[in-house]
Amino acid sequence: MKERTFVALKPDAVKRKLIGKIIERFENKGFEIVAMKMIKLDREMAEKYYEEHKGKEFYERLINFMTSGRMIVMVVEGENAISVVRKMIGKTNPAEAEPGTIRGDFALTTPDNIIHASDSKESAEREIKLFFKEDEIFDK
């Protein structure tokens, strides 16, 4: 089933100049990038983005990290995009991520694990709407 998912390349990916290498993996897998932009999250937007983690012990560190530099946000489209992209990025903790996954190959620590991808259709819809207007998303 063709679907869209949200992907964010976190500040550490941008700082370490990994943008092209990561995007190339999605394109090599046959996915289309149908929307993409560079942003810098402010605290208010970061809190909206991570509202489900509010109150957790790692929340402040996560917010501080996500507002520390530029990010790339994008909408990736293709067959079973949500589940396939999640497999491609690997486990949240880079130490547990398989070699060959994006985190397994490039990430160093948590939350500095270079990438985020939506984990469900509902999350994808919420995150895409949070970062993109409809006219910023293109069909082929």
Swiss-Prot record:
Keyword tags: ATP-binding, Cytoplasm, Kinase, Magnesium, Metal-binding, Nucleotide metabolism, Nucleotide-binding, Phosphoprotein, Transferase
Gene3D superfamilies in UniProt: Nucleoside diphosphate kinase-like domain (3.30.70.141)
GO CC entries: cytoplasm
GO molecular-function term, one example from the UniProt record: metal ion binding
Alphabetized InterPro entries for the sequence: NDK-like_dom (IPR034907), NDK-like_dom_sf (IPR036850), Nucleoside_diP_kinase (IPR001564), Nucleoside_diP_kinase_AS (IPR023005)
Subunit structure: Homohexamer.
Main location: cytoplasm
Record-given protein name: Nucleoside diphosphate kinase
Localization terms from the record: Cytoplasm
Swiss-Prot/TrEMBL GO biological process terms: CTP biosynthetic process; GTP biosynthetic process; UTP biosynthetic process
Cofactor: Mg(2+)
Annotated EC: 2.7.4.6
Taxonomic source organism: Methanocaldococcus jannaschii (strain ATCC 43067 / DSM 2661 / JAL-1 / JCM 10045 / NBRC 100440) (Methanococcus jannaschii)
Family in the record: Belongs to the NDK family.
